[in-house]
């Protein structure tokens, strides 16, 4: 049996299901490229049959990613598998992942079927997927609540049909680690052809046991772990990949397995996922939380100063979290900024140096010194907002006080035209938003507003993340500035640009559909 554990990332499929606003194709690609740098073996990036947007995302990522295998999800339905294959065919290497429920409860109440019918359907669909690729994964949905004898029958049949990976999900996060290990061991004992496939696990955190269950399964013989960065996902989330990866690295003495992950990319990938998905990382989150390597106890601090290994089982550097430096000021040139980005591991293709340097100079004039986390924040925001903008914040001014009604005046560039409006509001941010809404006449409803500090002290950058509802769809916007009202305004303008771009995409899709329809009529 191989000692390498395959890392299967589902941040962009199962993880995205938990988000309040869907990610754009560009945002998904940004995360996919980060996962590729981190070295994930397989990335599941969508459910193509679910929507044209998901199909486009899968196809775009499949075209761009070269060093990881790209995977798409499909139910045991002919159309699902055919559409998944169509979206993936541009990839260097791809996998089709198909699934069907196997537990008595799901078979009886959801599928209204029988186990024999489920097995027959699984065989047919695995064979159909094999017509497109020799890499087919089959999942037994709700395997954690499936009797072992039934599960063994399904697994044996799927392998005989051509499945090369068999996934055993704890779909509702119900099993205990010793139970889950028993399921994996039981399959090895009962399935005669199990050596012809890789056994995978997909766990959920409803009882806080997703990572524990995955590691127990690895110890019992599983050689693929599925999960999401930062553990994002439906309900209580998925298995946190960064936790499993580092547990395998730190406790190699017991597990005796390894991964092909570039550990130096873990922290940066985690931060990127957090920012793009608008899901802050708790300070006490294992591996990537801001307190993961902090020591406040005097006894602990003394021990760490004498020898870090007294209280640290891994180092910040082992996940790519290096010490903050204070070496850039308004007198630093473009070469210095580029050199620092190089040192932090960023490639030039990941940011626009001209835009970054302009933003850096403006910030350096305000703050004096610019930190690494400032540069990363500027690069991230620049990447998010580098697409052509229809709306641009030209000017704003607010007046408010403890006994005054907040008033805002806003100038907004709308295409080639600059428009101005003033409005009152419940505080300066609300006043700015009311003025922006008057200018655009978009009936935007604010669903979520969050503010986080990027840096330390009074000169920290304020990052505002908002989720807004427009015509039944949710859009995410982000803004960054030393002034909170300014970053709030920028976040709303980002939302408006996302709404405008979505409308333009919809117009283009309608135009293409009409063009195709006209061609059919001509023929």
From Swiss-Prot:
Enzyme class per UniProt: transferase
Domain of life: Bacteria
Catalytic function, reaction form: 3-methyl-2-oxobutanoate + acetyl-CoA + H2O = (2S)-2-isopropylmalate + CoA + H(+)
Assigned keywords, A-Z: Amino-acid biosynthesis, Branched-chain amino acid biosynthesis, Cytoplasm, Leucine biosynthesis, Manganese, Metal-binding, Transferase
GO biological process, one term: L-leucine biosynthetic process
Gene3D superfamilies, sorted: 1.10.238.260, 3.30.160.270, Aldolase class I
Protein name in the entry: 2-isopropylmalate synthase
Lineage: Bacteria, Pseudomonadati, Pseudomonadota, Gammaproteobacteria, Enterobacterales
């Amino acid at each position: 049996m191989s000692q390498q554990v395959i890392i299967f990332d589902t941040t962009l499929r199962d993880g995205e299901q938990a988000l309040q606003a869907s990610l754009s194709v560009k945002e998904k690609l940004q995360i996919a490229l980060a996962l590729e740098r981190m070295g994930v073996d397989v990335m599941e990036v969508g459910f193509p049959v679910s929507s044209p947007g998901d199909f486009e995302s899968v196809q775009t990522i499949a075209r761009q990613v070269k060093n990881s295998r790209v995977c798409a999800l499909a139910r045991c339905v002919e159309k699902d598998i055919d559409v998944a294959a169509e979206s993936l065919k541009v990839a260097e290497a791809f996998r089709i992942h198909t699934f069907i429920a196997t537990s008595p409860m799901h078979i009886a109440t959801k599928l209204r079927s029988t186990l024999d019918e489920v097995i027959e359907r699984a065989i047919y669909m695995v064979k159909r997927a094999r017509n497109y690729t020799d890499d087919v994964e089959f999942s037994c949905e709700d395997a954690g609540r499936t009797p072992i004898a039934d599960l063994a029958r399904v697994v044996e049949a799927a392998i005989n049909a051509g499945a090369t990976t068999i996934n055993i999900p704890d779909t509702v996060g119900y099993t205990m680690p010793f139970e889950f290990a028993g399921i994996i061991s039981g399959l090895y004992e009962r399935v005669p052809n199990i050596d012809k496939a890789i056994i995978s696990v997909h766990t959920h955190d409803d009882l806080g046991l997703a990572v524990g269950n995955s590691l127990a399964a690895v110890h019992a013989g599983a050689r693929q772990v599925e999960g999401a960065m930062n553990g994002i996902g439906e309900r209580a989330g998925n298995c946190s990949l960064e936790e499993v990866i580092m547990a395998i690295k730190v406790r190699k003495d017991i597990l005796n397995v390894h991964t092909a992950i570039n550990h130096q990319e873990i922290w940066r990938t985690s931060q990127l996922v957090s920012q793009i998905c608008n899901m802050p990382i708790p300070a006490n989150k294992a591996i990537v939380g801001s307190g993961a390597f902090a020591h406040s106890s005097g006894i602990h601090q003394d021990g760490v100063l004498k020898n870090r290994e007294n209280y640290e089982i891994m180092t910040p550097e082992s996940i790519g979290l290096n010490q903050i430096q204070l070496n850039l000021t308004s007198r630093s040139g473009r070469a210095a900024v580029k050199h620092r980005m190089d040192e932090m591991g960023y490639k030039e293709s990941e940011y626009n140096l001209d835009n970054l340097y302009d933003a850096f100079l403006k910030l350096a004039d305000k703050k004096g010194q610019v930190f690494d986390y400032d540069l990363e924040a500027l690069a991230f925001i620049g990447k998010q907002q580098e697409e052509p903008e229809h709306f641009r914040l030209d000017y704003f001014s607010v007046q408010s006080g403890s006994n005054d009604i907040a008033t805002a005046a806003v100038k907004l560039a709308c295409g080639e035209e600059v428009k101005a409006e003033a409005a009152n509001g419940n505080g300066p941010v609300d006043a700015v938003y009311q003025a922006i809404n008057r200018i655009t006449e978009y009936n935007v409803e604010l669903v979520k507003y969050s503010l986080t500090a990027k840096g330390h002290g009074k000169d920290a950058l304020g990052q505002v993340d908002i989720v807004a509802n427009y015509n039944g769809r949710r859009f995410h916007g982000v803004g960054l500035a030393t002034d909170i009202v300014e970053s709030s305004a920028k976040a709303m303008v980002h939302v408006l640009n996302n709404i405008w771009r979505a409308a333009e995409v919809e117009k283009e899709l309608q135009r293409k559909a009409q063009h195709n329809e006209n061609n059919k009529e001509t023929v």
